Amino acid sequence: MNDVFSTAQHKLDALGLRCPEPVMMVRKTVRQMAQGETLLIIADDPATTRDIPSFCEFMDHTLIASETSQTPYQYLIKKGL
């Protein structure tokens, strides 16, 4: 695992879930986090490569890093406002 991903304060395993479930779970998890905390999302749904960055932009969260060259995909986000 890349070092940047190992710094996450929270982890969400969305393996095996299909759209829209991964983003719904991300939203639920982020709601329970404090501003500035980080979340590692692990998923294998190809739709997440589009949905997670869009979610972050729409909800004012920061996509710190993503690894989508192979499954499982990994995303590290930082909760915004």
Swiss-Prot record:
Q: Where are the transmembrane segments?
A: none
Catalytic positions are 19 (cysteine persulfide intermediate)
The UniProt entry, under InterPro entries, shows: Sulphur_carrier_TusA, TusA-like, TusA-like_sf
- In this UniProt entry, which cysteines form S-S bonds? none
Recorded protein name is: Sulfur carrier protein TusA
Q: Which family does it belong to?
A: Belongs to the sulfur carrier protein TusA family.
Give the GO molecular function terms: sulfur carrier activity
Indicate whether Oxidoreductase appears among the record's keywords: no
Keyword list, A-Z: Cytoplasm
Gene Ontology terms, cellular component aspect? Answer: cytoplasm
**What role does this protein play?**
Sulfur carrier protein which probably makes part of a sulfur-relay system.
Which PROSITE patterns does this entry report, sorted A to Z? UPF0033
Gene3D superfamilies of this UniProt entry?
TusA-like domain
Where is this protein localized, as stated in its record? Cytoplasm
Secreted among the record's keywords? no
One of the GO biological process terms: tRNA wobble position uridine thiolation
